[in-house]
Amino acid sequence: MYPLLDRIEIPAQLRTLKRNQLPQLADELRNFLVESVAGTGGHLSSNLGTVELTIALHYVFDTPFDRLIWDVGHQTYAHKILTGRRTGMARLRMQGGIAGFPRRDESEYDAFGTAHSSTSISAALGMAVAARLKGVKQHAIAVIGDGAMSAGMAFEALNNAGVMDANLLVILNDNDMSISPPVGALNNYLAKLMSGRFYATARRAGEKMLGVVPPVLELAKRAEEHVKGMVTPSTLFEEFGFNYIGPIDGHDLDILLTTLNNIKQLDGPQFLHVVTRKGKGYKQAEEDPILYHGVGKFQPDQGIVSKPSAKLAYTQIFGDWLCDMAAKDSRLIGITPAMREGSGLVRFSKEYPDRYFDVGIAEQHAVTFAAGAACEGLKPVVAIYSTFLQRAYDQLIHDVAIQNLPVVFAIDRAGLVGADGPTHAGSFDLSYLRCIPNITVMTPADENECRQMLYTAFQLDTPAAVRYPRGSGPGVQIQQEMQTIPLGKGEIRRQGKQIALLAFGSMLTPCLEAGDELDATVVNMRFVKPLDQELVATLAAEHELLVTIEENTIMGGAGSAVMESLSSLDKNVRLLQLGLPDSFIDQGDPAHMLSDCGLDKAGIIQSIKERFSL
């Protein structure tokens, strides 16, 4: 079924193939990708778009000696298949299986771990400089998408790399434009010319010679820019100190191989612009690459078949609230750093296009942009994943909290996220938020509470964060009428004896189950900041043991807030803190992951019985 692919376990075997065999290999690899991802779920569109580029890179460069770094990393399935992990694709993103992103501890071919965007150029530059200092003739290659290139970190790295004169190759994987046949053919020819040794040598010699005659040098430079500017996007990357080549067709193996072989002979920073098509080779993914960006299991001959869910996802609850709130208050604006679909802003973007702002992969900018808007009387709502808010921590403190501005942070993917693993888990937000002055931090336990907490946050004139998990809640009916929740007040959901379970957010459901068996008091704490200290004091006076349960790291989290509150009381009460351990938790089924952390009914009961004789 896969005659060429079956012969390849490592790139060294790939390099034994003849060039005219590589198009067939690309077809086989693409077919295998569709079949494999259909059986496991995962990222599809981006991987189908990088098949030829992946083959060409491993064919031309001596990996793993030459360092190959994939930005974001969700487009690395072909890379994993060609580097000894084809059989592992059957357990892609599953517990004990291979990761959906590059991991250094998984393969020597994964030179750098990635999952968040725009880090590849910085990492590759560090490796290139290290090779130079060690006197090693080694190539460092960063493959970065056009979306990731919009982030400030990518341009910081380009700015630094241009003056380092290291052997760095940056490949821009541009899948947001198309090449018309005549322009494409001319660009392909010019790419061969500009990546050749003769052109590079002549260019450097000309710069040295004309450098002694500044007016002539400037005239020559402008002439070169004028000619190249007619057929290439711009000379922006030349201004950073790179030799710019392209754009070229990223699905034409002949031009890819020729260009990469030429670049391999050059010294200094090189920039190759390739144009690819997301979903290439699979009709459904080509027609709707966003739908097929991240997929569950499906039948390849049918494609994705939408199935209505019995429960609303928290993401949809947020999106519906945002539209309802926007209808009531014209000051509301919605901001997302390139996560319209993932954060639930599709409907809002269509109904309120003038109040919707997708700022690109620019989390730092998103937060300060919101702060500026808040200064002028608007009410910004920043929809962001917990793991990505980490990237804007200084802006959160310096630009929002210190100025006490009314910005609402709708924090999705709080806690464990399943198949995406530790790079995308929201394990730390309670810890890194609660230590910031002026901010209110809320943790809804169900669907209706999420809606009402978002409304409560919006009514405040100070910064506020509502953090909610991936997926759906326990199935509580949503009250359409919006009401504020008393600030900093928890609620007792079950009255028991001896033991009090203080649940934060998603942990209320397993705590209620455990509480029934233990005959324990169960409290929905609701707020991490301000903490309901009066309730904590009452619970401490009436119980022998308090147990805090949170889907956040134990260190510095909600349990720590309770412990700090207890330290000011003259009460002889024991405290047990349950939460995520001081380690990065690998991918898996969310329910199994929580069970492994002791955050289900059985785990909570077992932890209490192991620690205390009750």
Curated annotation (Swiss-Prot):
Pfam families: DXP_synthase_N, Transket_pyr, Transketolase_C
Superkingdom of the source species: Bacteria
Stored SMART domains: Transket_pyr (SM00861)
Residues that hold Mg(2+) according to the record: 146, 175
GO molecular function: 1-deoxy-D-xylulose-5-phosphate synthase activity; magnesium ion binding; thiamine pyrophosphate binding
Cofactor(s), by name: Mg(2+); thiamine diphosphate
Gene Ontology cellular component annotations, sorted alphabetically: cytosol
Disulfide feature: none
Keywords, ordered alphabetically: Isoprene biosynthesis, Magnesium, Metal-binding, Thiamine biosynthesis, Thiamine pyrophosphate, Transferase
One example of a Gene Ontology biological process annotation: isopentenyl diphosphate biosynthetic process, methylerythritol 4-phosphate pathway
Binding-site positions, thiamine diphosphate: 74, 115-117, 147-148, 175, 282, 363
Keyword Metal-binding recorded: yes
Cofactor note: Binds 1 Mg(2+) ion per subunit.
Pathway of action: Metabolic intermediate biosynthesis; 1-deoxy-D-xylulose 5-phosphate biosynthesis; 1-deoxy-D-xylulose 5-phosphate from D-glyceraldehyde 3-phosphate and pyruvate: step 1/1
Substrates-to-products reaction catalysed: D-glyceraldehyde 3-phosphate + pyruvate + H(+) = 1-deoxy-D-xylulose 5-phosphate + CO2
CDD domains for this protein: TPP_DXS (cd02007), TPP_PYR_DXS_TK_like (cd07033)
Job of this protein: Catalyzes the acyloin condensation reaction between C atoms 2 and 3 of pyruvate and glyceraldehyde 3-phosphate to yield 1-deoxy-D-xylulose-5-phosphate (DXP).
NCBIfam families per record: dxs (TIGR00204), PRK05444.2-2 (NF003933)
Family: Belongs to the transketolase family. DXPS subfamily.
Record note on quaternary structure: Homodimer.
This protein's name: 1-deoxy-D-xylulose-5-phosphate synthase
Species for this entry: Nitrosomonas europaea (strain ATCC 19718 / CIP 103999 / KCTC 2705 / NBRC 14298)
The encoding gene: dxs
